Amino acid sequence: AIIGINPIFGVLGTVFSGWLSDKVFKGDRKYPAFTAGVLEAISLYLFLFGGGSHFTLILSMVLFGIAIGVLISFLGGLMAIDLVPRKASGAALGIVGVASYAAAGLQNVVTGLLLDNNTVEAVNKIGETVTKHDFTYVSWFWLGAAVISFLLPMLNWRRRRQEI
């Protein structure tokens, strides 16, 4: 039920991102996107390594939802459109979409391999054989990917929109 908080705040993050970039940053999306990326990494860290208290889990899902809402709006389309001429905006969105699905697929494969290679069979207290998954490596992989996701857009910080 706690994870259900995420999409509610994701909607708020999406709506808020447009207002924030247009009114506060005059259409410059790099600073709010960077901030949302850092917030997403912090929220993921809290969720994975924050101790598991009820408050920490709820806080991590609130922050994660807001951050993902902003990032999906910006990185999923708006920043790509900002970097290319208007005539190429459809192609830019298509490339971002394909790259997103390819990266998500690769993430699923790597996550599966990390979990498969860090799984042990154990006998529980009542004598049943159970499978135990060690999420240590996969958690660090997810956190590393989150950090990369806010560092990569910095490569285009000085780039201006191309005009046609």
Describe the residue ranges of each PLM region:
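Loop-to-transmembrane helix entry
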Residues: 1-9, 91-95, 134-137
